[in-house]
Amino acid sequence: MLPITRRHTLGLFGATAGSLILPRMTFAQGKRPSVTIAVQKITNNNTLDIWNEQSNVGERVFFPNFWEGLINRDWMGNQGPVAGLATEWKRIDDKTLELKLRQGVKFHNGDELTAEDVVFSFSKERLFGNTEPKGGKTIYESDNKPTTVKELPAAVPGIGRRLWPALAGVEAIDKYTVRFHNATPDVTLEGRLYAFGSQITNRRAWDEAASYTDWARKPITTGPYMVGEYKPDVSLTLVAFDEYWGGRPPLEEIRFVEVPEVASRVNGLLSGEYDFACDLPPDQIATVQAASGFEVQGSTILNHRVSVFNTQNEILANPLVRRAMTHAIDRQAIVDALWGGQTVVPPGLQFDIFKTTNMFIDGWAAPEYNPQLAQDLLKQAGYKGDAIPFRLLNNYYTNQTANGQVMVEMWKQAGLNVEIQMKENWAQIHDPEGVKGVRDWSASANINDPVTPMVTQFGPNGEMQQKKDWTNAEMNELSVVLETSTDRALRKKAYARMLEICEREDPAYQVLHQNAVFTGMKSSLKWKAAPAFAMDFRSNNWTM
């Protein structure tokens, strides 16, 4: 059995620090190696834009090899903040953060990184559209309709306001100094800068692109690798950027290939076609480890698997039915049967890293497995056995199909009639046509504060509310408290109340288990897996 490691993050606040496509790994004389990585999916939206592709699969291909922020996440360490494109930062006040840029950083097009690029990366044109820096109000796609091919996709401004609800703008103090101005106080500004989305792009490349799509399929960034070739739904090849500020990249190319079936990823790895095979379910670990010259690395990560409810469904509009569904699931049985005990059932939508900021709610737990209580709640609700649709993807998440089948059987034993509807992609999952019911999802802690994922995913501009799956007025009021209050005790009290609302009184979701990632690889490769979806191929994580 693989050891499961837990990583704790640093605090949020103040810190200083100073095209040939190769089918497999090749060692040529005087040349760096290249690797091929089999993944279940490269991106969901067929773009390489961090704001448009906010996904687990996106994390894998984006970080830390391609996109970089002013503050970076310590992917191979405690997942806390480390200096990136900024060398130092300081608070001016509760609403203002100043950062000094690293000098001499080159973009992939040869331009030097300056304050102008940072200002642009958080501008209305690049990110916020016609939105205003006000929290607590849901922004829908229909509020932002592009009128030209150069404008942002309708969803992006609302996604931007998930992470930056009150950012009023970024000011260039001089060529290498910027100030972030928030409309409200925010104790998590530093954390938001190393969260998924806050990475920096080149202004000139955006201006020169003929359309948003052209830009988004080959963004110009500062990372150690740049886009060589991108074939949506097929492959992505990143090539070394030898002018990288952090030193010469160790690989010539990183090629991600889309291989949806687990068996095909495993067989391709063992045959030598691939150097890495991602998202292996635990029942495949022994197969890979038994083969000479191969190993599996993995751990739990800062992501929880959840199932979420659509309250426009007449049956699920009744919170008693949703509560019944949460008490009908034996989470530990799922962990034991499908994960071989290699992950855990967390205490609701909480992560151990919240303890570093004293925001962890002790004594809280996921809903207990209690089929009798579930049956009693259904009786109180007057449930008559009508079908509840369960839109399901085929193993987008590890073990997803098997997990869905197990849950349907558990619901059946409690008297719930849940019917699986297999879908091919996320567009079909979210299709407003037809009747929605329950679906799978996951929730990530991008920083060590519950503003992610509680507010960013379930608050007024979380996907749940933007897609009109669920809403709760008190939850939205508390989201503003979590986003704007500088009173730590008040913030913690608000978070505790959010858990009560979202997991007990008016369920938006139910947490199933902490996610874990397992990657099969050639044992000869001197590389270590991060406790994340991300795969680090920088020089400090690759040796020959």
Regions found by a protein language model. Give the residues of each.
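Periplasmic binding protein-like
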Residues: 37-38, 110, 276, 403, ...
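Structural transition elements
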Residues: 344-380, 395-402
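Periplasmic-binding protein-like
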Residues: 190-192, 286-287, 312, 316-355, ...
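Long beta-strand-rich cores associated with HINT superfamily self-processing modules
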Residues: 521-544
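Ligand-site clamp/hinge motif
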Residues: 124, 213-216, 241-287, 417
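Extracytoplasmic/peripheral linker and loop segments enriched in polar/acidic and small residues
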Residues: 170, 320, 335, 367-368, ...
